[in-house]
Amino acid sequence: MAPPAKRAKRGWVPPGYKYLGPGNSLDQGEPTNPSDAAAKEHDEAYDQYIKSGKNPYLYFSPADQRFIDQTKDAKDWGGKVGHYFFRTKRAFAPKLSTDSEPGTSGVSRPGKRTKPPAHIFVNQARAKKKRASLAAQQRTLTMSDGTETNQPDTGIANARVERSADGGGSSGGGGSGGGGIGVSTGTYDNQTTYKFLGDGWVEITAHASRLLHLGMPPSENYCRVTVHNNQTTGHGTKVKGNMAYDTHQQIWTPWSLVDANAWGVWFQPSDWQFIQNSMESLNLDSLSQELFNVVVKTVTEQQGAGQDAIKVYNNDLTACMMVALDSNNILPYTPAAQTSETLGFYPWKPTAPAPYRYYFFMPRQLSVTSSNSAEGTQITDTIGEPQALNSQFFTIENTLPITLLRTGDEFTTGTYIFNTDPLKLTHTWQTNRHLACLQGITDLPTSDTATASLTANGDRFGSTQTQNVNYVTEALRTRPAQIGFMQPHDNFEANRGGPFKVPVVPLDITAGEDHDANGAIRFNYGKQHGEDWAKQGAAPERYTWDAIDSAAGRDTARCFVQSAPISIPPNQNQILQREDAIAGRTNMHYTNVFNSYGPLSAFPHPDPIYPNGQIWDKELDLEHKPRLHVTAPFVCKNNPPGQLFVHLGPNLTDQFDPNSTTVSRIVTYSTFYWKGILKFKAKLRPNLTWNPVYQATTDSVANSYMNVKKWLPSATGNMHSDPLICRPVPHMTY
């Protein structure tokens, strides 16, 4: 007889929870709610404290504080009880003495400031005398709102010298600079780990870290800007174009967006290859982010002998970087993957946040003057004044709490738990005509080249929806459902904001270069996001993403469309082949014929596109919501992760006039490290077929798309990253 299975220790855990309570095991499965998840992190931290020789039960620890922060908005009774229990402990228990908190699955307290080490002030005293001779020559470079930074003459650029300041003297902002400021407050991690949980389930933990550079915004003001990217400036007459008008209004803000919502931020190419080849489904689990090792520097410029210019960089211990997290999703949602402005895809290369801006309502009146020639046709675009009915102007300062970080500080977002539907990582080859049982054959073939015969169509059994016809054929048989759908392609919607293209669900390519008619997505991107670093010129690199043939249930090369309604078995002249002309087109497109989006339609999520594709998206706040989004495969059923904003606090000079239209600022910039943890839940793909399946792999064939040289650096470090296949393995839909 087999020994009984060992049960996990539950401890004193109330009903409905797995970890909220003392004495339980750390392997109880998935937490039941966010409070239980916080309790699991708390238990893991306690376990690490005990292993390091410390007693967290008698002392108040950072893990206790983190649990308080994570349960402050708890709606469940257990989370509320635990929250107030540890608040009481904080009031009476002594603080746990520790130099560094043991590593756990959680995050540290937001905005906690590290005390500067004593050697900083020693360095300041030593450097003060060295810089005394330079102080009289230093001139503070100022910037005015809406003006460019003063730049030296490019003709003497080769004579410029840039160096760091010696030691740590006082900078223009009153802070201390130079010489080893602060203490490291985090780790730099870009690994992807796989934890196999049993029953085919896998927990994928993607770590990502980047060094970010944040400069001063051109202005400290919010600006409502009207954009005209065309030959005519102002509100004049515009020549007819190809729906390329960029006219709109936007609110430009002095803030920047730290956006990690792209596959290339989290996975290296080999991880993507492993996941696509090995996993059957994928779903988002949780996200946490952290900013640490903040360094704020000021720049002063002095003139040496002749025209030699010297820039001096000083660490500023009192200047600050402002951080805001829109955890309630109040502000306009602007995912940066759609403009290729997420964090860069190369962990060893510094990157920058994206300037934050959002659309603003703009009343417009379009009138067209027709002409026999395209050149003579003109469109008059009249832009009206803002309307009270639709105007929405948001400021971050009035909407969100803002944390001020100085050199050495850190900020954490806490853990966000996703609520999304799983994504299949396999594709389907089955169309409607591959559903249900097949007709029986009369005789088996007698040779490998022979074909089989079916029973005469008038003698077959089965159901059809054709009246007064006794035939039962493959074309006439009823099927359980419709696989795949499309919307009319090449359609432009128009409203007060102007025309825009209707999203199209991807299908396979019908003919030639006709990608857009079947929902192919065009990506334009720069060197931070996969463009060849050796490429010259300003034009971005581009590629077109086509879904795998029949991934949406349509394979035009192997199917046909019949005229409707069907009353008799169709003649050849009633069958539309892909070579037939429809509506003046030289090739056949299903989207010219019908729109099959209805209650009988079954269809997959859009492809996850590596590396440039967006991962998750925000659900539209309307009563009737779309069943999918074209731009991302995961749609959050509640609020998505809050947008993370950063902004350098204005570093003012002594020349400040509150009534002036300009603000005199010390030239300041910041570097800081960003770190994130994105967790997924995946299901291993079972091996079912006799034949080997198609896999994503590389080769050494010259000019091959999957030539491994694409993902290897050159002698000077140049490289680029092309998109990798997704959903390579087929699965049975029915």
UniProtKB/Swiss-Prot annotation:
Compositional bias per record (Basic residues), positions renumbered to this chain: 1-10
Region ranges (Disordered): 1-42, 95-116, 134-154
InterPro entries attached to this UniProt entry: Capsid/spike_ssDNA_virus (IPR016184), Parvovirus_coat (IPR001403), Phospholipase_A2-like (IPR013607), VP1/VP2 (IPR036952)
Keywords of this entry: Capsid protein, Clathrin-mediated endocytosis of virus by host, Cytoplasmic inwards viral transport, Host nucleus, Host-virus interaction, Magnesium, Metal-binding, Microtubular inwards viral transport, T=1 icosahedral capsid protein, Viral attachment to host cell, Viral penetration into host cytoplasm, Viral penetration into host nucleus, Viral penetration via permeabilization of host membrane, Virion, Virus endocytosis by host, Virus entry into host cell
Localization in the cell: Virion; Host nucleus
Pfam family, one: Parvo_coat
Highest taxon of the lineage: Viruses
GO MF, any single term: metal ion binding
Disulfide bonds: none
Region of interest called Phospholipase A2-like, as start-end residue ranges on this chain: 19-64
UniProt free text on domains: The N-terminus of VP1 is sequestered within the mature capsid. It contains a phospholipase A2-like region and putative nuclear localization signals.
The family this protein is said to belong to: Belongs to the parvoviridae capsid protein family.
Descriptive protein name: Capsid protein VP1
Organism, scientific name: Hamster parvovirus H1
